[in-house]
């Protein structure tokens, strides 16, 4: 069974309100859910986001994949960073969660290897095939100058 963390729309016309739910990927958007893990009110200023962090962490750990919208909300609350194993996740809402140090992060959360300290990143001046700014023509015809 493919499980997704996604948004379930409720509310009125032009007054959306979403529940962040865990559901089978084959069910309808507003169909049967396995568990509700949060709420999202996009109309409020500022938007209201509430996620039950321990339950979201559990579902992510057992393989539930968030949709793009749910992933954006998980990143805002810092739950995605906690799942990826970052020590200091950036969050607008502080929710204490303990993560076991022995677990490794899933492949989707791993970052590429950092650049070694001795290696220099290439700059524009290192590339001889690119023309420099000083090689640019200095004189521009008057008929082109007047046009904007």
From Swiss-Prot:
GO biological process: translation
Top-level taxon: Bacteria
The keyword Ribosomal protein is assigned to this record: yes
Keyword hit for Magnesium: no
Keyword line: Ribonucleoprotein, Ribosomal protein
GO MF entries: structural constituent of ribosome
Gene Ontology CC entries for this record: cytoplasm; small ribosomal subunit
Pfam families given in the database record: Ribosomal_S16 (PF00886)
PROSITE patterns recorded: RIBOSOMAL_S16
InterPro entries reported in the protein's UniProt record: Ribosomal_bS16, Ribosomal_bS16_CS, Ribosomal_bS16_dom_sf
Region (Disordered): 95-148
Family statement drawn from the similarity comment of this UniProt entry: Belongs to the bacterial ribosomal protein bS16 family.
Annotated HAMAP family: Ribosomal_bS16
Name recorded for this polypeptide: Small ribosomal subunit protein bS16
Native organism: Tropheryma whipplei (strain TW08/27) (Whipple's bacillus)
Lineage: Bacteria, Bacillati, Actinomycetota, Actinomycetes, Micrococcales
